[in-house]
Amino acid sequence: MVKKRINALIEQKKSFLCVGLDPDVQKIPTLFLRMQDPITEFTKSVVNATSDIAIAYKPNFAFYEALGLKGLHALDALIHHLPKNVVTIADAKRADIGNTSRLYATAFFETWGFDAVTVPPYMGYDSIEPFLSYKEKLTLILCLTSNSGSRDFEERRLEGGKLLYEAVLEKALEWNQFENIGLVVGANRAEELKRLRALAQGLCFLIPGVGAQGGSLEDSVRYGADANAQSALINIGRAVIYPDGEFSSIDDFEKAVAKKADEYVAAMRLALEQSAV
């Protein structure tokens, strides 16, 4: 079960770090752009620099699909390069009518071989069930996301007084018969994160929004982890994979990425110590 693997890795590495692998050709260092396959070499270098402290990697499919077959080949090369013991998350946000979702689930869990996938819940149970039928995988349901537009719908009050994201949590708990559901909750929503954790029992949280989106790392650790200081994946993308500076060699780049990742994990460990006091 993926959740057990996540918690074992948290315990082993003393880290909640999930690295967002979102290769943007406008931001990739020049030294990679001179190579035959810039995306593959860039993402491999990020993995090489972070694999000792990262517990998960989350490629966002849009960054690869936008490049057509070249991007999909790069994604395939990345998947084969990832260490076997880390957790892999397809950030694809796919769900549809049952038969289509069944094929999406097959694609992400079997064809691509991911451990987890992000899905929107708003088409209801029949759009989610095909993912949940993979009992050993993890389905991460969008609950309260980090973008400013989330207020347009996720914070709408429903009849009866519940907010939409609260109804999503309620359904996630109801559907979680195989203990293979997690939630996506933004790091920049500290009070809501705290409240959702109190209600969510032991559900695993994927927490984006730290760094470039302004979320607090300390709050993400304090409020996102469960009572056992587990069940949280704190995603950091741009702030780690695009360190400042010009790089004359892959080694220089990897050292800079490793330094940024180390700084974040050190801050996670400190926040964990402080929250335990």
List each language-model region with its residue ranges.
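Conserved N-terminal beta1-alpha1 strand-loop-helix module at the mouth
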Residues: 1-85, 252-269, 273
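Acidic (Asp/Glu)-rich catalytic clusters
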Residues: 10-12, 47-53, 76-84, 130-135, ...
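Short, well-ordered coil/turn segments that N-cap beta-strands
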Residues: 13-17, 52-55, 84-86, 115, ...
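Conserved, mostly hydrophobic/aromatic
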Residues: 19, 57, 91, 117, ...
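Conserved anion-binding
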Residues: 25, 30, 96-184, 202
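Active-site-adjacent beta->alpha loops and helix N-cap segments on the catalytic face
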Residues: 66-81, 97-101, 122-136, 188-198, ...
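A C-terminal functional module that forms or caps the active site or interfaces directly
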Residues: 187-235, 239-240
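C-terminal helical cap(s) of enzyme catalytic domains, especially alpha/beta-barrels
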Residues: 219-229, 242-277
